[in-house]
Structure formats: C-alpha cells, structure tokens
Regions:
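Short, Lys/Arg-enriched N-terminal segments with co-localized hydrophobic residues
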Residues: 1-16
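Conserved, mostly hydrophobic/aromatic
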Residues: 39, 47, 77, 104, ...
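Acidic/histidine-rich catalytic cores of soluble enzymes
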Residues: 19-22, 47, 150-251, 255
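Catalytic domains of carbohydrate-active enzymes, especially glycoside hydrolases
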Residues: 35-52, 119
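Glycine-rich, proline-tolerant flexible connector loops at the mouths of alpha/beta enzymes
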Residues: 50-72
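Active-site acidic/histidine proton-transfer and metal-coordination neighborhood
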Residues: 33-34, 71, 76-79, 94-197
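Active-site beta-loop-alpha junctions enriched in small/polar residues
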Residues: 23-27, 50-54, 89-92, 128-130, ...
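Short, acidic/polar
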Residues: 29-39, 103-112, 213-220
Length: 300
C-alpha cells in the first residue's frame, strides 16, 4: 500500500521510497484540470513540467509567468496531491546567435523566478551545442565550447542563487556536457550550491559507450553522486541505421537494467524525485509500478 499525501511516496511501515513522477507532456492530451487526477491515479506523486510542451493552451513568455499564474497552478497541483518536481527549460546555452541567447537568458531568469513562486525547488536544463541548430557536432566536445557554456551558465546560476532555486544540468552524450567528468568540471568551476545534476542515465549513452553502460553509470554515481538532485527514468532500444542508433522508450520496455541505480537511490537519496520519460498514456502506469516493485525488492 502506498501513501501519496502531497507527493510523499512511502510504504506503510516507514520504508523510504523514491518519489516517482511523470513528464507531463507524455500524458494524455487533456486540459490540465482533467489530466492531473488521471496522473495521480496512475501512481505518480510528482511531475516534470515543461511549460511550453505541457501547457500549450497558455503562453509561457517571461511576461506571462506572473504570481497569479503561479498560484493558480500551485493550488491545482496541491488539490491533486502532486508536486512539481522540476520545471524544464531546455534551451541551447551555447548558441552562436546572440539574439537567441538574449531571449534564452530572459527565459531562464523567468523560469527560475516562476519556480520560486510555485514552490518548485528546481529548474532543469540540458547543456546545448555550439550551433544554431542545437545538434551534435564534433565541436561539442571541445574546451572552447565548454568555456562558452560555462560563461553563459554563470549568470543563470547567480539568478538561481538569488531566488533560492536549484539549477539542475543534465549531461547528454550528444551535448557539450557529454559525460560525468565534464559535468564534474562544470560543477567545480562554478562552485555554487545551487548548481546540481539531473541524472538521466540513458541520455549519457551513445553507440560508443552503450556496451559498457554500467561503467558509465558507476562513474556518474562516483563523480556526481553528492550533487544528483533528481533522476530521469527511461529505457532504450537499438535502432540500427536510424538516428543515433538508440531510441528512448518507457522504463522497463527496453535494454536497461536499473538495479544499481535504484540501489544507489535507496541507500543515498531518500525521497528523491524521479520522473519517467518517453512513456505513453497506455504504458505509464505499468512502467512506474514495475520500477516500484524493483525498488521494493532491493536490499542495500
């Protein structure tokens, strides 16, 4: 039996659990007032909220993110006993287009302010690519690109500090922060307690490292563990000749073994938010229940 009061997901008897959530734009396409009870009913206790994707009926420009809007959303989520685990604002922080960057900075500042008004402690972001298309290129893995990213990140982290919000960066194999060592370098160089990590294991994989993925995950836990503020759960299947050769799917429907990651969370991260991605409305409830069962059965 699970007690989901205001997002606290725990087994009766006091065993600490992960707080499993859903990336909201993977859910049914319904008005928010109708959607949230469905999400709660599937066994989720929190959501990953990307305003531009999940709330398309409303503008998400900086000027639209007012205290009134935040209170409306906060009350609606509280009514349905769902936490907003993170607000996603996934823009390219290394674009060479200065006009784009001006707009992007303002969006980050506005999302951080909005998160503080919502009572949401975290804004999540990926780390970009040094081109206007926001796509992988060999220059993603250069010191020059990393320096550009860090320069752009610093004022955004400062804004997060001012509002008491955590900015969580998500390493992705095809982006500038492409692995655990690079991510550790960013954290150390900026040196802020308000800069942490959103750990998405599948996003750290590509065809070059997928064969030794457990080593990749272990390195991430060893180097980034103290700074991991949230986790994304999804899975992958091989797609030879398509895209990058790996396709993201719902957790438990592909090749991933989450045993060691779940053990880490159970031992080190009480009540951490962990949102599922790439689910469908048809399989989301099964995916989260499967993860809960795996988690319960683990001994640490």
């Amino acid at each position: 039996l699970y007690d989901g009061i205001f997002g606290v997901c725990k087994k009766i008897g006091g065993e600490i659990m992960v707080q499993f959530g859903l990336r909201l734009h993977d859910a049914e396409k319904l008005p928010l007032e109708e959607l949230l009870p469905i999400v709660k009913g599937k066994g989720f206790s929190c959501v990953h909220l990307a305003l531009s994707k999940a709330l398309k009926e409303y503008p998400c420009t900086p000027s639209a993110l007012t205290p009134g809007y935040s209170n409306y959303l906060r009350h609606l989520f509280e009514k349905n006993e769902l936490d907003i685990a993170v607000i996603g604002n996934y823009l390219n922080l290394a674009s060479p287009d200065e006009e784009y960057m001006k707009v992007a900075r303002e969006k980050y500042y506005a999302h951080i302010r909005f998160a503080s008004l919502l009572g949401c402690g975290m804004v999540g972001t990926e780390t970009g690519a040094p081109n206007v298309e926001y796509k992988y290129c060999p220059e993603c893995r250069t010191e020059k690109s990393l320096s550009i990213f860090i320069k752009e990140l610093k004022p955004i982290v400062k804004c997060a500090e001012n509002y008491g919000v955590t900015l969580a960066i998500e390493p992705v194999a095809r982006h500038i922060v492409w692995g655990p060592k690079v991510c550790r370098k960013v954290l150390d160089e900026i040196g802020s307690h308000n800069l942490q990590v959103l750990f998405d294991p599948v996003n750290m994989l590509d065809l070059d490292n997928v064969g030794h993925r457990e080593e990749v995950f272990q390195e991430a836990i060893e180097l980034l563990g103290p700074d991991i503020a949230m986790v994304h759960f999804k899975d992958f299947v091989y797609t030879p000749g398509e895209g990058y050769g790996l396709k993201s799917v719902g957790a438990g429907t592909g090749e991933m073994d989450y045993t060691n990651i779940l053990k880490f969370l159970k031992k080190e991260k009480p009540f951490i938010y962990a949102t599922l991605e790439n689910t469908t409305p048809e399989n989301a409830a099964w995916c989260v229940e499967n993860l809960k069962k795996q988690y319960d059965q683990l001994e640490v």
